[in-house]
Amino acid sequence: MKKRPTSAYIHIPFCTQICYYCDFSKVFIKNQPVDDYLAALMEEVKFYDLPALRTLYIGGGTPSALSEDQLDYLLTNLEDLLDLSQLEEFTIEANPGDLTADKIAVLKKSKCNRVSLGVQTFDDRMLKKIGRSHNQAQIYETIAALKEAGFHNISIDLIYALPGQTMEQVVDNVAKALELDIPHMSLYSLILENHTVFMNRQRRGNLHLPNEDVESDMFDYILQELEKNGFEHYEISNFTKPGFESRHNLMYWDNSEYYGLGAGASGYIDGMRYRNRGPIQHYLKSIREKGHSRLHEEFLSQTEQMEEEMFLGLRKKTGVSIERFEEKFGISFEDRYGQVVRDLKNEGLLQEEDRWLRMTKKGLFLGDTVAERFIIED
């Protein structure tokens, strides 16, 4: 019998403010049927009858946009419905501006053991410029309050190559991030997505971004500075102190299956990738009628599974095991990708050691470009 996934992602689509760069499934929380949504989420959890979970991740949107009572309802009911006896990691995303002392107390009495904060930048002017609702002072207050409550597995997200951002500002951000004394950071370069404020500005010629050389210098500096301070660069955008890797995210990069629950959530079960309906009312109606809200379902061919194995695995510092690939897919790696690998090695983008393939530093900066080379038309 096929082993069932032991990870689940739960989506809370509500936000108190819509950030200018964000294209995730989200809505402004005011006047939304939040209680109905949380109740529907529990029905969806029951529908899937999940096995014992190893990792659980609540993302958004902004889970901390929920009121204290709503957050308590969410966490208490999840713990009642799910088997968390084998749980290793339970992450919740939060914003520094709305994670109050009362909400931290709710987290503290739950099984949540990891908090990921959407910091993005420490620069108050830049925070306003990108549509964030918190300020620098709130970042420090929230981290201090979490530590005081006993949370030590704390991660922050930072974005670089923001509109008008200089190298000096990146240097300052990295210094301030290191001062927080936390064990995990995710650093992303700004990517312009469709249907965002920033993309609309770009199309009108009103968005001034650092050029690719400056962005590359920023990436090099971040890498060098964090590694110098005891962080391991274990995935293209992620840095960890020993033992604090995001186990849930490693599950994605290992191309493992997982449940995706909530409006707009994606999941991967029984060889099928699926996406739930995004609009809240459509999600609620679907849960009432069917128990689930899957809209888009796609069974992956072996070719697609191999492509995903490569471009997800190469995101990690450890890279892709040729042996594991051949065991999983029952074909010769050399026959399938030998020429692609030789070309990428010659271009200085890939390296091989003990039948493991990993990206070079240059390859990491050009990550998506390298990944695309593994898409081969049969």
Language model features with spans:
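Local cysteine-cluster metal-coordination motifs and their immediate loop/turn environment
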Residues: 13-24
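A short, conserved structural fragment
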Residues: 345-355
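Minor-groove-contacting beta-hairpin "wing" of winged helix-turn-helix DNA-binding domains
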Residues: 356-360
